[in-house]
UniProtKB/Swiss-Prot annotation:
Domain J: 220-286
Subunit composition and interactions: Homodimer.
Superkingdom of origin: Bacteria
Localization (cell): Cell inner membrane
Protein name: Co-chaperone protein DjlA
Topology class, membrane: Single-pass type III membrane protein
SMART domains assigned: DnaJ
Pfam family of the protein (one): TerB
Cytoplasmic side: 32-286
Functional description taken from the UniProt entry: Regulatory DnaK co-chaperone. Direct interaction between DnaK and DjlA is needed for the induction of the wcaABCDE operon, involved in the synthesis of a colanic acid polysaccharide capsule, possibly through activation of the RcsB/RcsC phosphotransfer signaling pathway. The colanic acid capsule may help the bacterium survive conditions outside the host.
């Protein structure tokens, strides 16, 4: 019960400090306790062979699925391995976590890798944290698209992942379109310029992307936000704020996102912001 700390905190705060203020203070302290217990609590993994923290399970599941997707194309190439290594660098994994990630990637390449079981266990470990689960699917989509294309086997694996965490076909296709547009949009000059102006995360290597660098694409910007070209300013702003709320790094961290994954969350927020800014600039909106 992830709210037990809040309940206990309310009664203790009410007794110690008196009144509603004391109860609210107790709820806040209890919330912090619930969060820490959730982060430190171990989860059972029949696949990785030991009890893990949720953060470790997130990281190992990510690389195991990446290995499975790489194998789906027939054989794992040196490019696939290099892309996995680049992701480890982007996540700034220490030596111990790099070793775990490599082991998970190798496990995912096995012919009998139980994809649905792995994702189901991950879903259960995340509980009701839908934003965290959606972000996990996005990470897999981004990684799979790093070579500039998605074949039918890769798409089927991605849909299996999305379906297992409870997404519909429509939700999956919408998210995939948004992710692919973000990849295209990110390869354009506007995103690089925006990121450099913000002192952002362009120090990392993105050699795996093979999209054309033809500058900003307004249609991709619309797709990044999941909106139509003719939507009014208020509708665009609502979509932008909703996505920024879902991808806020601090909020994802509070729901169990590993520290190592924060860089990807920040990059996603940058993409959303850059797309919104380009739309506003094109439309002449303030």
């Amino acid at each position: 019960m992830q709210f037990i700390g809040k309940i206990i905190g309310f009664f203790i705060g009410y007794k110690l400090f008196g009144g509603l203020f004391g109860g609210l203070l107790g709820i806040f302290i209890g919330h912090l306790a619930d969060k820490k217990l959730y982060e430190l609590g171990s989860v059972r993994s029949s696949i990785f062979g030991k009890n893990l923290t949720r953060q470790s399970l997130f990281m190992q599941t990510t690389f195991a699925v990446l290995g499975h997707i790489a194998k789906a194309k027939g054989r794992v190439t040196e490019d696939d391995i290099q892309l996995a290594r680049q992701l480890m660098v982007r996540l700034r994994l220490d030596n111990a976590n790099q070793q775990l990630a490599q082991q998970a990637f190798t496990l995912g390449k096995e012919a009998n890798f139980p994809l649905r079981q792995v994702i189901q266990e991950f879903r259960e470990a995340c509980g009701q944290r839908a934003d965290l689960l959606r972000f996990f699917v996005e990470v897999q989509m981004q990684a799979a698209a790093q070579d500039g294309q998605l074949d039918i086997n890769e798409q089927q694996i991605l849909f299996t992942i999305a379906e297992t965490i409870g997404m519909s076909r429509f939700q999956f296709e919408q998210m995939l379109a948004m992710v692919m547009a973000a990849q295209q949009f990110r390869s354009g000059g506007f995103y690089q310029q925006y990121s450099q102006q913000q002192g952002s995360y362009q120090q990392h290597s993105y050699d795996g992307y093979q999209y054309s660098n033809n500058g900003p694409n307004i249609k991709d910007a619309y797709t990044v936000l999941g909106i139509n070209e003719n939507d009014e300013h208020n509708a665009v702003k609502r979509a932008y704020r909703k996505l920024m709320n879902e991808h806020h790094p601090d909020k994802l961290a509070a729901k169990g996102l590993p520290d190592e994954m924060m860089e990807l969350a920040k990059e996603k927020a940058q993409q959303i912001q850059a797309a919104y800014d380009l739309i506003c600039k094109t439309k002449g909106w303030k």
